[in-house]
C-alpha cells in the first residue's frame, strides 16, 4: 500500500487539508498519516487548530514522525494552505530538509494555496517547474523566502500558471485554494493509484 504524509500546523486551512486526506483514504490503496508540526500556539503535541478554529487530532506528533519516516520515505508528502499554517510549516528547518530529501528521492511533493509559495519555494524545488498557488501570492515569494534564498533563484526557469486548478510537473503537484481542493485531491489519488480508481471514486462520491 502507498504511503502519504500530511503535515498540519496551527492555522492550516481545513478544507484544503482534509479533502485530500478523505479522498486518498477512500481509495483504499493509500495509507494516510497526518503529522502535527510544532508551532508557538500549540498546547498539545497531537492537536492542531485550523484557521477556522476546528481542532484536528493528528495521527502522529512530530517526534513520532521523525522516528518513523526520516529514513523510510513515503510515496507522497502534502502541505495544506492557510497563511498562518503555511508560515508555521515554513519555519520548521527539519521539515524544509525533509522536503528536499523527498524531492531528490523522486517522491511526490504536493501543496495547495499559500503553501507552494510560502513552504515549497524557498526549498528550491520549484526551479524549472510549472506551478500554481493562491492568486497573487507568487508576487511575494521574495518576502516568504525571508533572505534564505532570492525569489529569482527559488523560481529560476519556473512558470507560474494562474488559471489551472492544479499543476503536475514531474513529482511536484501544486494547487490554488479551497475551491480547487477536490480536483487537486483527485489528482493525488490518480498519481498514487491509477486513473480507473480515480474514476470510480469520482462516480461514487457524485462529483460534478
Q: Where are the model-predicted features located?
A:
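Extended, subdomain-level signal for the structured scaffold at the beginning of enzyme domains
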Residues: 1-105, 117-122, 127, 138-163, ...
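A short beta-strand/loop micro-motif in the catalytic core of glycosyltransferases
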Residues: 109-110, 131
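Short, thiol/selenol-centered motifs that function as redox-active sites or metal-ligating centers
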Residues: 112-114
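Catalytic cores of processing enzymes, dominated by hydrolases/peptidases
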Residues: 133-136
Amino acid at each position: 500500500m502507498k504511503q502519504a504524509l500530511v503535515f498540519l500546523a496551527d492555522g492550516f486551512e481545513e478544507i484544503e487539508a482534509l479533502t485530500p486526506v478523505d479522498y486518498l483514504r477512500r481509495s483504499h490503496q493509500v495509507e494516510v498519516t497526518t503529522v502535527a508540526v510544532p508551532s508557538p500556539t500549540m498546547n498539545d503535541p497531537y492537536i492542531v487548530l485550523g484557521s477556522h478554529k476546528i481542532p484536528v487530532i493528528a495521527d502522529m506528533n512530530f517526534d513520532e514522525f521523525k522516528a518513523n519516516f526520516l529514513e523510510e520515505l513515503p510515496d507522497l508528502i502534502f502541505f495544506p494552505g492557510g497563511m498562518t499554517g503555511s508560515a508555521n510549516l515554513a519555519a520548521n528547518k527539519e521539515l524544509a530538509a525533509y522536503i528536499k530529501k523527498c524531492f531528490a528521492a523522486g517522491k511526490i511533493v504536493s501543496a495547495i494555496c499559500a503553501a507552494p509559495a510560502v513552504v515549497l519555494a524557498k526549498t528550491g524545488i520549484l526551479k524549472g517547474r510549472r506551478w500554481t498557488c493562491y492568486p497573487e501570492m507568487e508576487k511575494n515569494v521574495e518576502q516568504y523566502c525571508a533572505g534564505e534564498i532570492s525569489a529569482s533563484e527559488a523560481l529560476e526557469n519556473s512558470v507560474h500558471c494562474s488559471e489551472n486548478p492544479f499543476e503536475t510537473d514531474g513529482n511536484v503537484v501544486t494547487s490554488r485554494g479551497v475551491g480547487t481542493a477536490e480536483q487537486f485531491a483527485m489528482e493525488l489519488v490518480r498519481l498514487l493509484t491509477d486513473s480507473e480508481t480515480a474514476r470510480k471514486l469520482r462516480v461514487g462520491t457524485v462529483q460534478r
